[in-house]
Amino acid sequence: MSKLQDVIVQEMKVKKRIDSAEEIMELKQFIKNYVQSHSFIKSLVLGISGGQDSTLVGKLVQMSVNELREEGIDCTFIAVKLPYGVQKDADEVDQALRFIEPDEIVTVNIKPAVDQSVQSLKEAGIVLTDFQKGNEKARERMKVQFSIASNRQGIVVGTDHSAENITGFYTKYGDGAADIAPIFGLNKRQGRQLLAYLGAPKELYEKTPTADLEDDKPQLPDEDALGVTYEAIDNYLEGKPVTPEEQKVIENHYIRNAHKRELAYTRYTWPKS
């Protein structure tokens, strides 16, 4: 293991192997402890995409909220559907929601807001690329979740995990923004392991991961965008050997996207070297 890989493995907190029952108990306890430590929290808000990560986090949150209510703490889980117009995998979103069984479902179509933002920028002389418009979608989705959380005395729960965090494969202040990120410390295959243990339909954790943000490249697989497989990323995070090319791609992503893992730099926190 290289020196940098050792540093990254320590930072990303991924275990070489997990016990599903113990991990789920630990994740639920984190969520419950956070709510219990903040008496103002009356709801937890999460956008549901139909993918592996939001399905897992959604199930964990609902399980945690159920237990909190049994313990006398009034709390609600609000699952949010955030389509841009007509969502291509809407059936999978609904399948995920049936598995999660959230207390409440809110649907907000982000297309009008995103399109108006893009048009307003265009009128000001700023023409966004399709990729940049994809980031607008991610930020609008998170803005909506924070608006709901504000209205319902809640917090926003994130889906960031270590295989995503190491590569910076999320939009800054978009899907990378949240109050808590319960599944940080898991890699991609461990997330699949937990969903299988929880009895999720295979389609929800065996589907090809995609951010699906770009109009010109619908359903673009994450692995194509990253230039490396999740299998390699997971192996790297577990301290296992990967090919030199895989190591180079992973570490370049990690270094290039360091700013995404930090709050705004100050003159005291900017790592100049």
Swiss-Prot record:
Keyword flag Acetylation: no
Keyword NAD recorded: yes
Highest taxon of source: Bacteria
Binding site for ATP: 47-54, 159, 188, 210
Record-listed E.C. numbers: 6.3.1.5
GO cellular component: cytoplasm
Species annotation: Staphylococcus aureus (strain JH9)
NCBIfam families reported for this sequence: nadE, PRK00768.1
Gene name of this polypeptide: nadE
Top-level class of the enzyme under EC nomenclature: ligase
The protein's annotated pathway: Cofactor biosynthesis; NAD(+) biosynthesis; NAD(+) from deamido-NAD(+) (ammonia route): step 1/1
UniProt name for this protein: NH(3)-dependent NAD(+) synthetase
Known role: Catalyzes the ATP-dependent amidation of deamido-NAD to form NAD. Uses ammonia as a nitrogen source.
